[in-house]
Swiss-Prot record:
It is found in: Cytoplasm. HAMAP family: FBPase_class1. This is Fructose-1,6-bisphosphatase class 1. Its cofactor is Mg(2+).
């Protein structure tokens, strides 16, 4: 069975980019070990600090962030880093060709209940003539990503990745600590009968989106004429992985709860990498008005509405909204 190195070699990925991906792989293997040990490793519970998002940091958030930073900073091909847990860009190595952004541990509310969590990452080529610690490197459209992926720490540890080809899935063998290719090209079904959305926010939704979800819930007797099941993991990695494996639509729309912050998910290291993975698997990924990968970021931690998944269902949702 082919390993990650063999897969990248067959795809003729540039050697320096391969090395950056291997640094992410190494870090995620370390994180996976700590996740598996849980309370035995003393990594559960919260810290007394908040990140730039105003969110209370879990111990494993901080540990995962430190592991990824150390692994990537040790790679001479990495010019700079950006993380959900860091206020600003972190300069790494002068002369590095790539910049890497990541959410070190998505779904951290699931940590203490042994639920699904994961690491999301994206890689861009650094801009010429721009200082290493400049945010400009990261304000590129998502269609400029040279690699995107996530590692899901679940019943098995999986890496889902796309470089310059399909969205592929690799499974970690805990005995050999090797990621082996188990699905060469994931394909999202065009149609679905599953949706993922946080219904607790329904009272804050805009009327058109509320109408769309209401019709999903009506089942066979409603205008959609079929039964839909709702699934919600409170982890973007877990919910998007399900969509990639068997279809569905994942939605985190804008809402009115906080007028200064109408969206929840971050464009750079959540929406963009997931959008690329979904599109390379035949699905669609939009905010409420345009393709996510065509959005030009304005800020490092910019937030955006996300609607992604099976092509026909995303199109139907957008018809309601527009």
């Amino acid at each position: 069975m082919q390993n990650l190195q063999g897969m990248l070699r067959d795809q003729r990925v540039a050697q320096d980019l391969q090395e950056v991906i291997f640094s992410i792989e190494l870090a995620c293997k370390d994180i996976a070990k700590k996740v598996q040990l849980g309370a035995l490793a003393g990594v559960l519970g919260a810290t007394e600090s908040e990140n730039v998002q105003g969110e209370t940091q879990k111990k494993l958030d901080v540990i995962s962030n430190d592991i990824l930073k150390a692994s990537l900073a040790a790679n001479s091909n990495v010019l700079a880093l950006a993380s959900e847990e860091e206020d600003n860009v972190v300069a790494a190595n002068a002369g590095g060709r790539y910049v890497v952004a990541f959410d070190p541990l998505d779904g951290s509310s699931n940590i203490d209940i042994n639920g699904q969590i994961g690491t999301i990452f994206t890689i861009f080529e650094a801009l010429d003539g721009v200082a290493a610690n400049s945010g400009k490197h990261f304000l590129q459209q998502g269609n400029k990503q040279v690699c995107a992926g996530y590692v899901l720490y679940g019943a098995s540890t999986l890496m889902v990745i796309t470089v310059d080809g399909p969205t592929s899935c690799l499974t970690l063998d805990p005995a050999t600590q090797t990621f082996s290719l188990t699905n060469t090209a994931l394909q999202v079904p065009d149609q679905t009968q599953e949706f993922a959305v946080n219904l607790a926010n329904e009272r804050f939704w805009l009327p058109k989106f509320k109408s769309y979800v209401a019709d999903l819930k009506l089942g066979e007797e409603g205008v959609r004429g079929k039964r839909f099941n709702m699934r919600w993991n409170a982890s973007m990695v877990g919910d998007v992985h399900r969509v990639l494996m068997r279809g569905g639509i994942f939605m985190y729309p804008s809402d009115t709860r906080n007028p200064k912050q109408p969206a929840k998910l971050r464009l750079l290291y959540e929406a963009n990498p997931m959008a690329l993975l979904i599109e390379r698997a035949g699905g669609k990924a939009f905010n409420e008005t345009q393709r996510i990968l065509d959005v030009t970021p304005c800020a490092l931690h910019e937030r955006i509405a996300v609607i992604l998944g099976s092509e026909q269902e995303v199109a139907t949702c957008l018809e309601y909204l527009n």
